[in-house]
Amino acid sequence: MGKKSSDPAVVEINDVDELELEVGEEVTSKKKKKEKEIRTIEDLPGVGPATAEKLREAGFDTLEAIAVASPIELKEVAGISEGAALKIIQAARKAANLGTFMRADEYLKKRESIGRISTGSKSLDKLLGGGIETQAITEVFGEFGSGKTQLAHTLAVMVQLPPEEGGLNGSVIWIDTENTFRPERIREIAKNRGLDPDEVLKHIYVARAFNSNHQMLLVQQAEDKIKELLNTDKPVKLLIVDSLTSHFRSEYIGRGALAERQQKLAKHLADLHRLANLYEIAVFVTNQVQARPDAFFGDPTRPIGGHILAHSATLRVYLRKGKGGKRVARLIDAPHLPEGEAVFRITEKGIED
């Protein structure tokens, strides 16, 4: 008992068992090695040089970018089947460690690394849990003159400050749809906050969007600028769209065009979310309001964009004019903050208490 049998047949069987075990271990080892070897998009299953080139041309040049894409997107840009696109995305997610479950305590630690940009107003910062968050879309809506664009100008200056002063040492991308960006106002805010106005202007990249298609294209081009500045001392940390819905509203009129408009707006918001999460930037969008003829009580206005925008924005803030030239900000929706209000002023410093 316990001794190895001298029977040749038994020895042979034992040897085969050991051989199969070794082969099994070798296959497992090779499989693990193969999984670890996915470093570039060419390493993904089904991605050859031609497909890789098409993906790169469309902006999908990293595993992370592919991991957060949709199968339909890859199908269109690479000319592959939806099934093949899904396999590529799943492999990219696994390689980039995206789309997997995480313990809540680990997720809490991850959220602690989220950056926040001061608005310039302590009361508004407190309402927003410390400022405008990175990895999120903050929507601010209100009537003309409520302070939406003034807040955007202030944030474009504040984000360039060091973290201890309320900034993120970052650059800004500004997509202007209504010709409301004013470099003169940036200079004024920067000067009154003790900054070099010329240096501040150098780190704001502005593009005018002339229609909704152009607006969506500029978001894609914004990613190129984000990548270009990624490893510099002033990476992009804030993307502003002022205003988000004006072109969509003017181009798609009537109930017959509503479905197409909302579908297009949903795609636009998905692209903004992808940039916010992939590059850890804050996305700040302004929105207009429209009258509610059926409202007999309460506020007679509502933001444009419907349920698509309501569910896509991480935080929603309603601005209105208050007494004595002051402005009132009301936090309408946030996943981690209670509703509340903050009062601020618009001065030569931009937004302040």
From Swiss-Prot:
It comes from Pyrococcus abyssi (strain GE5 / Orsay). ATP binds at G142, E143, F144, G145, S146, G147, K148, T149. Keywords: ATP-binding, DNA damage, DNA recombination, DNA-binding, Nucleotide-binding. The gene is radA. Signal peptide: none annotated. The lineage of its organism: Archaea, Methanobacteriati, Methanobacteriota, Thermococci, Thermococcales. InterPro entries: AAA+_ATPase, DNA_recomb/repair_Rad51_C, DNA_recomb/repair_RadA, DNA_recomb/repair_RecA-like, DNA_repair_Rad51/TF_NusA_a-hlx, Hlx-hairpin-Hlx_DNA-bd_motif, P-loop_NTPase, RecA_ATP-bd. GO terms for molecular function: ATP binding; ATP hydrolysis activity; ATP-dependent DNA damage sensor activity; damaged DNA binding. This is DNA repair and recombination protein RadA. Belongs to the eukaryotic RecA-like protein family. One of its GO terms (biological process) is DNA repair. PANTHER family: MEIOTIC RECOMBINATION PROTEIN DMC1_LIM15 HOMOLOG, RECA/RAD51/RADA DNA STRAND-PAIRING FAMILY MEMBER. The keyword DNA damage applies. It comes from the Archaea. Involved in DNA repair and in homologous recombination. Binds and assemble on single-stranded DNA to form a nucleoprotein filament. Hydrolyzes ATP in a ssDNA-dependent manner and promotes DNA strand exchange between homologous DNA molecules.
